[in-house]
């Protein structure tokens, strides 16, 4: 039997990765949860691996910082000021 290298699976081809991403998306603030849940309901099946990487970066933020970005009170800065994060953030803001 051959070992399968799961690191080569994309987000779309691996349901476990999708489940982990949804689990990481759970937030402490209801407002963030609502926005993120709507986002997943609309875009989950269309997410690229770059989108998943950007979401992962956003989900590492404290809840209040994420809410400020989602509500456009602030714009991404530093390591978050990259096209992939800005793209995902625009999708999150649109839902």
From Swiss-Prot:
Cited InterPro entries: SDH, SDH_sf, SdhE_FAD_assembly_factor
Pfam families the record matches: Sdh5
Domain of life of the organism encoding this protein: Bacteria
Record's subcellular location: Cytoplasm
Any one cellular-component term (Gene Ontology): cytoplasm
Main location as per UniProt: cytoplasm
Biological process, per Gene Ontology: succinate metabolic process
Keywords carried by this UniProt record: Chaperone, Cytoplasm
Keyword Translocase among record annotations: no
Function text: An FAD assembly protein, which accelerates covalent attachment of the cofactor into other proteins. Plays an essential role in the assembly of succinate dehydrogenase (SDH, respiratory complex II), an enzyme complex that is a component of both the tricarboxylic acid cycle and the electron transport chain, and which couples the oxidation of succinate to fumarate with the reduction of ubiquinone (coenzyme Q) to ubiquinol. Required for flavinylation (covalent attachment of FAD) of the flavoprotein subunit SdhA of SDH and other flavinylated proteins as well.
Family indicated by similarity: Belongs to the SdhE FAD assembly factor family.
Protein name, UniProt field: FAD assembly factor SdhE
Species the sequence originates in: Ralstonia nicotianae (strain ATCC BAA-1114 / GMI1000) (Ralstonia solanacearum)
Native organism taxonomy: Bacteria, Pseudomonadati, Pseudomonadota, Betaproteobacteria, Burkholderiales
């Amino acid at each position: 039997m051959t070992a399968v290298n799961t690191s080569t699976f994309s987000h779309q081809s691996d349901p476990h990765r999708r489940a982990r991403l949804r689990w990481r998306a759970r937030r402490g603030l209801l407002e963030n949860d609502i926005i993120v849940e709507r986002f997943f309901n609309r875009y989950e099946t269309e997410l690229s691996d770059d989108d998943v990487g950007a979401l992962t970066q956003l989900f590492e933020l404290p809840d209040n910082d994420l809410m400020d970005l989602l509500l456009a009170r602030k714009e991404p800065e530093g390591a978050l000021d990259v096209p992939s994060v800005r793209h995902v953030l625009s999708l999150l803001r649109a839902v």
